[in-house]
Amino acid sequence: KYYKLVANGFIIVPSYYKTIIKDAETYMDLSLKDSPEKDILLMRKYAHILDKGLHRSDVEAGHSKNIYEMLKSLIERLSTTKYSNDATCIWAQSKLKKYEMLQEEPKSFKPFRGKEITSKISYEDLVSLIKLRRSNRAFKEQLVTEDIIIKLKEVVNWAASSCNKQPIQLFVTNDPIWAKECLMCCKGGTGFSDFVPTFWAFTANCRGYVWPSEMYLPFVDVSLGAQNIFLAAETFGLSGTILSWAQKNIQENLQLRKLLSIPDDCIIVFCAVIGYPLYRYQIPTRKDI
């Protein structure tokens, strides 16, 4: 830490930036440490970089050798961890093999191509679903089953993420008593019905973001994935309300992490309550773009 200050200099800022800077430094320090969690995030990143090149019509042998070597090294390290059979690890291995084919037989190489697929969902149906999504704070006394929670979690990683890192980790409880206790950690958790069906913490593993310039990417990545969940929730008759985590204090942060067993390397981006609405809130008018 002191080396970073000497090497990069320092500035004086208002005291209200203290918590923000402390959080950023904490996550930056964690991201610099080696771990399997960091390796798999970076593995997806480097596999994504190779994948982009392997889709190009003008792809040529000889490019991105450093990326290839880093990816190969990461896959080898992960082969002795719990991530060895992870679907994305197997996917990354296929990119590695395709890259090797390009180097060995460039003249006969055929770039990657996906299947031609036409969506069966019309623009009108999609817009209708988007407009149907509504934030609600009053819920029926009806439990949200584990099966539905699993189905909602399955859609989160189908959103885009920076360099395909897929950093999102979800921490959820469908115990109404427990959910209500979690809600008390959020300053925006007011005006809710007494029955709180589920509580969700949307987090990003910080270990895949190793540069200061990437500081805000976890918030972008999590938000993109979360939108998938809220749209999918509407298809089950569920509605969710997002709760900002920007105003949390030290005690609230510690308490929520304890309640949901959220590790230190997961950045809590925001939280949410999801359940069956007791009644629908009116739709606010939207401005034109």
Region annotations inferred by a language model:
Residues 1-289:
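Acidic, surface-exposed loops and disordered segments
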